Design a protein with these regions (language model features):
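Alpha-helical cap/lid subdomain in secreted, periplasmic
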Residues: 107-241
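Residue-level signal for mature regions of secreted extracellular proteins and peptides
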Residues: 22-23
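C-terminal motif of bacterial Sec signal peptides marking the signal peptidase cleavage site
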Residues: 26-28
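Bacterial N-terminal signal peptides that target proteins for export
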Residues: 2-19
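Bacterial signal peptide processing site
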Residues: 30-33
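Gly/Ser/Thr-rich beta-alpha loop segments that engage phosphate groups in nucleotides
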Residues: 65, 71-73, 101-104, 131, ...
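Serine-esterase "nucleophile elbow" of acetyl-processing enzymes
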Residues: 37-101, 111-120
Length: 241
């Protein structure tokens, strides 16, 4: 397969919901409810145990609920579906789901060593930042955290793919929303990263691909996300062969 990254990046700031910044994407990754600590710990333990036992480079997905597979069986989560698609294309990779619902960029940074480095990762796919927005964390702090994650990856010779949580509607120039929207492409340019511009392309605003909360993708919705992301990752992973 091949992917037109330029074309993907060109599809920016469109959508049908006049909200600040991707509520259907960002809330989907939002902070867990009050009774969630035990669930979150369970998800974390399950995530770290979900390595696909195959050959090839170790690919760790570091993210929040969209990575963890909120509301879905473990085998239907995004990393697992990506692994299945890659395998069907004859591409071997040992995929690890290190997604934790409710995680912020600070959480991802604090657990990088045991979630990513300890897994002997060759490649880390970073999809974090949504919960920072919901919690009102300053965009500059988010950028610093993501930058530190990228630097940790580099210090450990781990290649990094940065996944953007792109707004679906226009944002006002100079606003906090615009500052958040600029974080990912700016970091990708600064560090020369592989940059995936929109995680929920083809799924956001599609009720038949979302769970009853209207936020989290169904198994079919995740499949759409996985097909797009797998297409993007294929040449990156093939380069390890």
């Amino acid at each position: 397969m091949s992917v037109d990254q330029t074309g993907m990046q060109g599809t920016r700031w469109t959508g049908i919901v006049p909200i600040l910044i991707s509520a259907a994407i960002l809330v989907a990754c939002g902070a867990p409810p009050a009774d969630a600590p035990a669930e979150r710990a369970s998800q974390s333990q399950e995530s770290m145990a979900s390595a696909i036992p195959v050959q090839g480079p170790v690919v760790v997905f570091l993210g929040d609920s969209l990575t963890a597979g909120f509301g879905l069986p473990a085998e239907d989560a995004l990393p697992e579906q990506v692994a299945s698609i890659l395998k069907s294309e004859g591409i071997e990779a040992r995929v690890i789901n290190a997604g934790v619902s409710g995680d912020t960029t600070a959480n991802g940074l604090s657990r990088f060593d045991w979630s990513v480095t300890a897994a002997d990762a060759d490649l880390v796919v970073v999809a974090l930042g949504a919960n920072d927005y919901l919690m009102g964390i300053d965009p500059e702090r988010v950028k610093q955290n993501l930058s530190a994650i990228v630097q940790k990856a580099r210090e450990n010779n781990i290649e990094c793919v940065l996944v953007d949580l792109q707004p679906r509607s226009a944002v006002e120039e100079g606003s906090r929303d615009a500052a958040f929207a600029a974080i990912y492409p700016e970091l990708a340019t600064q560090f020369g990263l592989k940059y995936y511009p929109s995680l929920m392309t083809g799924v956001a605003n599609q009720p038949d691909l979302l769970q009853t909360d209207g936020l989290h993708p169904t198994e079919k919705g995740v499949r759409v996300m996985a097909e797009n992301l797998a297409q993007f990752l294929e040449p990156i992973i093939e380069a390890y062969e």
